[in-house]
Amino acid sequence: MESNLKINKVELRNLRMEDYDQLAGSFKRIYADHDVFWTHAQIKKLITIFPEGQVVIVVDDKIVGCALSIIVDYNMVKGDHTYAKVTGNETFNTHNPNGNILYGIEVFIHPDYRGLRLGRRMYEYRKELCEKLNLKAIMFGGRIPNYHKYADTMRPKEYIEKVRSREIYDPVLTFQLSNDFHVRRVIRNYLPNDEESKHCATLLQWDNIYYQPQTDSYVAVSYTHLTL
């Protein structure tokens, strides 16, 4: 991140369909080595089924970050699962408004704007949303992209411990741990083409300490837009 980058305004807000062209441009910059990006139809569906779960960071009228999520039931994701399974092969038919887990399916910051704690802002929003909707936790599968450098000499468990103790830096896991997430387990083949992570991912979780289990008399919290 260039220290002399001049920024006048930073805004966190819900994603809108008119943002798609800018969003697609950022996707192509970040995932330049991949041929597949989020389609217009996929973004439209996410906004339709769960608008509060989709947010962007806007810096001086430019979209530089995005976080996408759905709601699922804990029983679906507490054990081994894949990204394809939890997203319904990216159809998001797995979204369950009556579930109890806020599940992260995407987060990114444009390379030119990293190091400004913008990602942390989106995670704080997710935590606020989790509490607002009375969900049990935030969960997601996290890559460990530096693991391939150590895979010949250590198992994933040892690698994770060394990242936790700050003996090793991992750009994804180090960030997640610094945001109060903990590793529940290692899941294999979460993203089958993730060679950098050696086909491993960490199942990460942040617990909502204010969560109140639903009872028969529980009235579901409506998707009220948060003030951003």
What residue spans do the PLM features occupy?
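A short beta-loop-alpha structural element at the N-terminal edge
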Residues: 9-23
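Helix-loop element at the rim of GNAT/NAT acetyltransferase active sites that forms part
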Residues: 14, 25-38
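Active-site rim helix/loop that mediates acceptor-substrate recognition in acyltransferases
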Residues: 33-59, 63-76, 81-93
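Conserved acyl-donor/pantetheine-binding loop and adjacent beta-alpha core of acyl/acetyltransferases
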Residues: 67-106, 124, 143-171, 182, ...
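Active-site acidic-Proline motif in GNAT/NAT acetyltransferases
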Residues: 110-112
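Conserved acetyl-CoA-binding loop-helix of GNAT-fold acetyltransferases
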Residues: 115-130
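C-terminal "cap" of GNAT-fold acetyltransferases
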Residues: 167-182, 189-222
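Conserved small/polar residues in nucleotide/adenosyl-binding loops
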Residues: 224-228
